[in-house]
A protein has these predicted regions:
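Structural signature of PLP-dependent enzymes
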Residues: 196-226
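Short, structured loop/turn "capping" segments at alpha-beta junctions
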Residues: 167-170, 199-203, 237
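Short, conserved beta-strand edge motifs with alternating hydrophobic and charged residues
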Residues: 147, 204, 238-242
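Conserved PLP-enzyme active-site core in the AAT-like
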Residues: 1-196, 231
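Catalytic-core signal marking the mid-to-C-terminal active-site face
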Residues: 227-249
Length: 249
């Protein structure tokens, strides 16, 4: 995308840990940032109106470290994929056989930064909905990136999944050798992925998921034990257990 335009919603121009900001990352990459929509509402029409001959990609960034609630609207990866396939005037009839290559002919990629990298449905455990990597790939995103630690539960690394054509292009980039993960990191990621072959095993073996999905009664029991031990010490400060909503991260 060097020298080309990357279209991003204004509501997704996030700053992550370490003061890294999406606009600055894009600038360093050589891409030209093109903002659309507003902080709280962005529609598919905003993306369509911003497309030009210089457009190389639609970038969707999941706001995993904050929320905008209330009068809001956003565009899904699936909608962006559908838009990218409709931007090219086909000279042949679109059939199931050539549909896969239709997006590639338009020349506009759909790239999504998921951040935490969830592989299971957290709603099954009473937690807020988070888009999974599988859902976004199935929705049509050409490349999905996420962290190897955080909710994924592995080593600190960046993970890229997507269409083979684009992953291969990144494999052949001159910077790969300097940025590639070492063997220990790769081994750690592989072992975590093996856990995900069985969701129940993943929830039990991966510390982050185990703590996030721990039943409320179990948490209460542990809290009561800690409080009792503290209070039995005769400290001047007494502890009591109360119901609350905790935040992870």
């Amino acid at each position: 995308t060097k020298g080309g335009e990357v279209i991003v919603s204004r509501g997704e121009l996030v700053e992550i840990g370490g003061k890294f900001r999406i606009p600055e990352v894009l600038e360093l990459s050589g891409a030209i940032l093109k903002e659309v929509g507003t902080t709280n509402r962005t529609r598919i029409e905003d993306y369509k109106a911003a497309v030009s001959e210089k457009t190389k990609a639609f970038l969707k960034v999941h706001t995993s470290n904050y929320r905008i609630v209330g009068f809001t609207e956003s565009v899904s990866a699936e909608e962006l994929y559908e838009l990218s396939t409709g931007l090219i005037e086909c000279t042949q009839e679109l059939t199931p056989e050539n549909f896969e290559n239709h997006t590639e002919r338009s020349g506009i990629l759909v790239i999504e930064d998921l951040g935490s990298g969830v592989l299971i449905n957290l709603e099954e455990y009473g937690l807020s909905k988070e888009p999974t990597v599988q859902e976004e790939v199935k929705a049509g995103a050409d490349v999905v990136c996420f962290s190897g630690d955080k909710l994924f539960g592995g080593a600190q690394a960046g993970v890229l999944v997507g269409k083979k054509k684009y992953i291969d292009q990144m494999r052949n980039h001159p910077l790969l050798r300097a940025l590639r993960a070492d063997k220990f990191t790769m081994t750690a990621i592989e072992e975590v992925l093996k856990c995900y072959l069985d969701q129940k095993e993943a929830v039990q073996k991966i510390p982050t998921l185990r703590m996030l999905t721990r039943p409320v009664e179990e948490i209460k029991e542990k809290a009561m034990v800690c409080a009792d031990r503290w209070n039995q010490e005769g400290a001047s400060v007494q502890i009591r257990v109360e119901k609350c909503i905790s935040k992870a991260g």
